[in-house]
Amino acid sequence: MSLTIPYRSSQFSVGYNDYDGVEAETGLRFRILFMKTGSEETISSRDYETAVLIIKGKGTIIYNDRECSFERSSWIDQNPVVAHFPAGDAVTVRAGQESRIAVISTLNSNQFKGKIYTPAEIDVEHRGKDILDGTCYRLVRLAFDRSIAPEPARIVLGEVLNFPGKWSSYPPHHHEQSEIYYYEFSPVEGYGHGELGDDVFKIQHQDLLVITDFRDHSQVAAPGYHMYYIWAIRHMKDNPYKGFEFTKPHDKLLI
């Protein structure tokens, strides 16, 4: 498996929409929770660490004694609300409007203190802005990694806003840990291309790319279309994700 397209440019069903086979390849389970106005959903698992990321919608997210309102009409210029919690805990989402939510999980019995990250707590990096004539300028939004989440956690999570006609995940780079990219486009008929080693895939709305085996994974959006993707990485046992390695000789582009 490399590119999975069960929901390409289609309407999600109400409830959970599972990207089958992804967990077997990466250790990460990825689902889209589609909620109608006025509905409520409690997200929990006895065995899985879980992250909940608001892609679009309006409502309230409740974790432990904290209640946090969210309203995100566009991923182009708004940061997400993200909840991250261990196995055994539960998050409740109440949808004030139709909402689309990513639910990322991994088997992990380790206990840690969960948290809700507000839009103001999302770290935004203007990566590539001043190099290569701005051709790989993008926004990288980090929800949490090893330096932010408690050490027993196994998920790293963030977003990329890939501007029209520009590259991201560039210069080419790789890492040992498995990763997934979930894509959306604005307008939704947009497309881009994703490299995976020597293979190149045409990416469309609601596709998911599985990245394994040290393969490079640079991306590019077609002119006229914003490309957005959620990226999630799973720490390996005794080998947590601490960053990527640029691929030679392309690393010289940064000198």
Predicted features by range, described:
Residues 76-96, 106, 203-224, 230-234:
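Conserved metal-binding segment of the jelly-roll/cupin
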Residues 46-67, 164-165, 170, 176-208, ...:
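Glycine- and acidic-residue-biased ligand/ion/polar-headgroup-sensing regions
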Residues 87, 95, 103-108, 144-147, ...:
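Short, structured patches in soluble enzyme cores that scaffold and shape functional sites
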Residues 31-32, 37-94:
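Extended, compositionally biased flexible segments
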Residues 9-42, 133-180:
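A short glycine-rich, His/Asp/Glu-containing loop-to-beta-strand
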Residues 30-34, 51, 82-84, 103, ...:
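Conserved hydrophobic/aromatic beta-strand scaffold that supports enzyme active sites
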Residues 2-9:
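Intrinsically disordered, low-complexity terminal regions
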Residues 99-140, 195, 230-255:
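Double-stranded beta-helix
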